[in-house]
């Protein structure tokens, strides 16, 4: 009976020692998310970060790194969206000038084109504010990280 108990304890110790560190298991997913951002595949990067959260709840170091990296993903995505909105606005501005050339200010076509241009300008400004927001958020996290020495 004593031998069985000792054998059971030894088996439990061996089984508990063989568990892998969750941080080392989750690290490849974070690296894959980084590669997805380099390739401008933001949906895949977000999905990988979400899978780290759900599949490795005990991998605290990698989860913190993923949390910080998600801000970087959002920042890069916002920069792309801002560039797109800016180019659409510039095209709309040229179109507005072309359509309204020679028409009086009170003409319905001018008014409609002006409203369209205003909505494009608002979208461009919204995207630029989004870029600034994520840039400030990343800068604040870096300041906090330097002060505390933590992730």
List each model region and its residues.
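Short solvent-exposed coil/turn linkers within tandem alpha-helical repeat scaffolds
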Residues: 53-64, 96-111, 115
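Alpha-solenoid repeat scaffolds
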Residues: 59-60, 80, 127, 148
